């Protein structure tokens, strides 16, 4: 079932060789919803119906991973149903795509942000945690937030699980979405979101600018102002960039 039509939820997924788990929490009602593909339980239809009903999702590194896997599932739903795939066959396909997505991360994505099933807010990207100097995991964030529990996965994600281990996995995933929710509601995050909303409205930035880091917002605004002043096309200006393997500081500083 779906919680309601066109709502926004905070979510996380777990992918193992023989199990797919999706947990989401409604940002308004705090109701948690669960979908599982494992053993005798196959929530594929309900999961896809739920994903198509969403107005937006909030996660941590969800642009590069969670939303990619969910889009893959949506794209293959009809084929799996037509071929009457059982849960083990579906999870095998999902696990394979999950590994491919992890291996291609930071190179290119299978599905661009504009082609995803709903809008995404990625707290990981917005706070620029994908920068080498600021890199932060959700577990590290839980510690920094003094969250009530900082849990490491009780299961090897490259393994298959048992029925008893599924309960542990659900508890682990639930802790992740609750800590993501706490970070979403943190004052620092609220300020960053309001800043981006204001800039997007004032300067007609695209909706996905909410996921831009502060430095990217600055560079995009400079490009916008420059193109408006020179009447140049932003795509053409980007092509004029000089590729450099190194910079001699003595040539830059007098």
List the model feature ranges, each with a label.
Residues 2-3, 14, 136, 144-152, ...:
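Conserved "right-hand" nucleotidyltransferase catalytic core of DNA-directed polymerases
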Residues 17-22:
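Short N-terminal binding/cap micro-motifs at the start of the first secondary-structure element
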Residues 23-27:
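A generic structural motif
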Residues 6-15, 120-122:
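Two-metal-ion RNase H-like nuclease active-site motif
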Residues 1-6, 49-51:
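A short acidic-Thr-Gly-centered motif at the start of a beta-strand
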Residues 121, 153-154:
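Short beta-strands and strand-loop turn motifs
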Residues 28-140:
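Conserved DEDDh/DEDDy metal-dependent 3′-5′ exonuclease domain
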């Amino acid at each position: 079932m779906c919680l309601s039509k066109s709502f926004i939820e905070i979510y996380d997924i777990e992918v193992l060789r023989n199990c797919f788990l999706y947990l989401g929490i409604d940002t308004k009602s705090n109701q948690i919803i669960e979908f599982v593909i494992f053993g005798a339980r196959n929530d594929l239809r309900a999961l896809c119906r739920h994903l198509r009903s969403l107005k937006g999702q909030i996660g941590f590194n969800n642009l590069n991973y969670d939303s990619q896997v969910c889009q893959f599932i949506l794209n293959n739903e009809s084929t799996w149903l037509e071929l009457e795939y059982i849960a083990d066959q579906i999870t095998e396909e999902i696990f394979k795509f999950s590994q491919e997505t992890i291996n291609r991360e930071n190179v290119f994505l299978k599905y661009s942000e504009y082609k995803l099933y709903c809008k995404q807010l990625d707290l990981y990207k917005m706070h620029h945690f994908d920068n080498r100097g600021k890199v932060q995991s959700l577990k590290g964030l839980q510690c920094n937030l003094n969250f009530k529990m900082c849990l490491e996965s009780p299961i090897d994600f490259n393994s298959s699980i048992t029925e008893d281990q599924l309960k542990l996995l659900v508890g682990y995933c639930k802790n992740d979405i609750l800590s993501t929710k706490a970070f979403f509601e943190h004052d620092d995050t609220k300020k960053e979101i309001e800043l981006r909303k204001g800039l997007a409205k004032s300067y007609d930035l695209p909706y996905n600018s909410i996921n831009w880091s502060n430095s990217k917002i600055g560079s995009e605004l400079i490009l916008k102002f420059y193109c408006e002043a020179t009447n140049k096309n932003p795509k053409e200006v980007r092509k004029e960039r000089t590729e450099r393997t190194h910079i001699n500081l003595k040539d830059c500083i007098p």
